């Protein structure tokens, strides 16, 4: 048995059994059995089930948002945004699978997409509704069947969304849910009868999966992993706007987005010091409250264990010589040890660990010039998101061509994303772009289909071929 706990008050809100290896095997066999008939349906026929599912999501939007908020600690207004984003992706996913045609000298040449088969989808805890269904929708559209394993920290919202899929009339076996911890995930990822795996989560787990799948090149592995994301601020006139975008980039979702700014890089000037002073003063004013608080910007992190880990990270940096500009503290008086205040720490004089951490802690580095800022931005094995706040187009051009990242932002918060653009990184941040048309590259494989509606001899036969004439009586 395992349980889900509301991080705002430590209340147990869900209990259930972990799926055993035998139950995982049964789910995969159901998906395999359902695959041939599901794949035979046209995309339009498959889309009708998805459209029905999304209508049900819209009807239950507030209840789903409340469940999401209770289970993750995400403030309620942000939980509503996640449910809305999940719905809005569908139209773009559908457009990605429209057939493309080309003309040959006789007949037609089509580029079509064929489904892989049975896909395992692993969801993260920070966006437990939006991200996994961002994989599930295009995979179903393409004709795959799915076994979905959500994060062990978010079983309740995953169960509720899954029940809406079932209510949509989806044929039995097309989408299967297995709940559990690591053993359940291992049983699914190692199952010999899955054709691919879509994983969103930590780079540590992603590397394990990458090694595991190295011996199975016939199976597709799509990884959307973490980041140690840099934000450079330089030559900005509107300091208040830059401070606002920095707060949004670092502390939204209590710092629990893979695209959040982890490293703030400043060229050491008097203007940068003004910016930093205002950032610290403004961050002190951030309202932290329960997930149901409509006026709060930050709720708790996902668990008390995660909060403890983050506080230890801050302590380690201080012991190395980092200087807290705004100390991240426990706010247990709000209801649990999972509540933290935002923290800003000057790490200019120390070497920091190049590791992703999920939480409201921003590391600051002061450098001598813009070239040094870009070098510091690239001082990471990750390559997910990177941003520049600057009035200078010249600096942005230098930044764009110099920085290594899959998501590059200029005068925008790092955590923003467009459903019509590829989402994903380079390096240790993964190999997957689970957005828009790029999802089609992972959910189906392209097939060139050259077609003519009749057979006829060419005007001139190839050299060395002589055909006998068929007898009229024969």
Write out the residue ranges for each language-model feature:
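A short hydrophobic/small-residue beta-strand
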Residues: 145-147, 324, 407
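Short, well-ordered beta-strand elements within core beta-sheets of diverse protein domains
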Residues: 13-19, 34-40, 121, 231-234, ...
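Rossmann-like NAD(P) dinucleotide-binding subdomain of oxidoreductase/dehydrogenase enzymes
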Residues: 101-241, 367
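ALDH superfamily catalytic-core signature
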Residues: 13, 205-347, 410, 466-471
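N-terminal Rossmann-like NAD(P)+-binding subdomain of aldehyde/semialdehyde dehydrogenases
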Residues: 1-108, 302
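Conserved C-terminal structural/oligomerization subdomain of aldehyde/semialdehyde dehydrogenase
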Residues: 9-15, 194, 232, 287, ...
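Residue-level signal for inorganic ion chemistry
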Residues: 10, 46, 68, 90, ...
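Structural signal for hydrophobic packing residues in well-ordered secondary-structure cores
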Residues: 35, 39, 54-61, 65, ...
């Amino acid at each position: 048995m395992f349980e889900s706990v509301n991080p705002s008050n430590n209340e147990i809100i869900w209990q259930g059994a972990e799926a055993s290896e035998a139950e995982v095997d049964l789910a995969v066999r159901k998906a395999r059995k359902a695959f041939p008939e599901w794949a035979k349906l046209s995309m339009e026929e498959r889309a009708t089930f998805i459209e029905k599912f999304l209508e049900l999501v819209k009807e239950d939007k507030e209840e789903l948002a409340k469940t999401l908020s209770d289970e993750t600690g995400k403030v309620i207004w942000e939980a509503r945004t996640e449910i809305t984003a999940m719905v809005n992706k569908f139209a773009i996913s559908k457009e990605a699978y429209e057939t493309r045609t080309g003309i040959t000298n006789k007949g037609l040449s089509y580029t079509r997409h064929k489904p892989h088969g049975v896909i395992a989808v692993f969801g993260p805890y920070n966006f437990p509704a939006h991200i996994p269904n961002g994989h599930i929708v295009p995979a179903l559209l393409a004709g795959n069947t799915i076994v979905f394993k959500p994060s062990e920290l978010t079983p309740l919202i995953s169960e509720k969304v899954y029940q809406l899929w079932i209510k949509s009339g989806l044929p039995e076996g097309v989408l299967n849910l297995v709940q559990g911890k690591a053993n359940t995930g291992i049983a699914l990822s190692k199952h010999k009868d899955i054709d691919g795996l879509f994983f969103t989560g930590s780079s540590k787990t992603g590397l394990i999966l990458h090694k595991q799948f190295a011996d199975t090149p016939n199976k597709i592995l799509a990884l959307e992993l973490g980041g140690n994301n840099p934000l450079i601020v330089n030559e900005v006139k509107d300091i208040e706007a830059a401070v606002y975008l920095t707060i949004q980039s670092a502390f939204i979702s209590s710092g629990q987005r893979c695209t959040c700014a982890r490293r703030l890089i400043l060229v050491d000037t008097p203007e940068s010091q003004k910016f930093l002073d205002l950032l610290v003063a403004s961050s002190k004013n951030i309202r932290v409250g329960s997930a149901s608080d409509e006026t709060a910007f930050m709720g708790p992190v996902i668990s008390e264990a995660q909060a403890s880990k983050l506080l230890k990270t801050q302590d380690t940096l201080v012991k190395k010589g980092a200087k807290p500009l705004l100390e991240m503290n426990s706010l247990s008086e709000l209801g649990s040890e999972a509540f933290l205040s935002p923290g800003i720490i000057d790490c200019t004089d120390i070497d920091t660990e190049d590791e992703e951490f999920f939480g409201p802690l921003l590391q600051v580095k002061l450098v001598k010039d813009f070239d040094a800022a870009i070098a510091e931005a690239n001082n990471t094995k990750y390559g997910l998101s990177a941003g520049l706040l600057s009035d200078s187009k010249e600096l942005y051009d230098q930044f764009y061509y110099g920085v290594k990242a899959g998501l590059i932002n200029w005068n925008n918060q790092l955590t923003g994303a467009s459903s019509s653009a590829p989402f994903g990184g380079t390096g240790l941040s993964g190999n997957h772009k689970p957005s828009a048309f790029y999802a089609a590259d992972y959910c189906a494989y392209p097939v060139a289909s050259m077609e003519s509606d009749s057979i006829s001899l060419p005007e001139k036969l190839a050299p060395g071929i002589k055909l006998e004439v068929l007898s009229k009586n024969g």
